Amino acid sequence: MKILTAQQIRECDQYTIKNSSVSSISLMERAAEACTEWIIKNIYHINKINIFCGNGNNAGDGFAIARMLKSKGFYVKVFTNMSANFSTEAAKNLKRLREKGDIEILDYEKAFDAKFEENTCIIDALFGTGL
């Protein structure tokens, strides 16, 4: 397995977007689909998912994953900074998630009071290559 630096990953994303006629949001959807399929295959016995999203493109991945997992029957909660300035792609996927209408989207502050049940998967979509 080759391990890439954050800069190399950004360059790979930009190369793919530029040379494959794939938009950034489409690339994000592909990544979310791959993550969703991995979760379904590997942690199918857990149906509760909490996703923590930042405000960059990694958050956009998290919002897309939340939407996809919900459509597969998982119980999903999303925690994010509701007053954040989201990246363009993250804002688009947050809008799509809100339009779905049946997923709890909570501010980070609620995480301190939340009771995380046993057998709940927690997904980190806070930090990406921009960290």
Where in this protein do the model-derived segments appear?
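Positively charged, low-complexity intrinsically disordered leader regions
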Residues: M1-I46
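Glycine-rich phosphate/dinucleotide-binding loop and adjoining beta-alpha-beta core of small-molecule
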Residues: K2-L4, Y44-L131
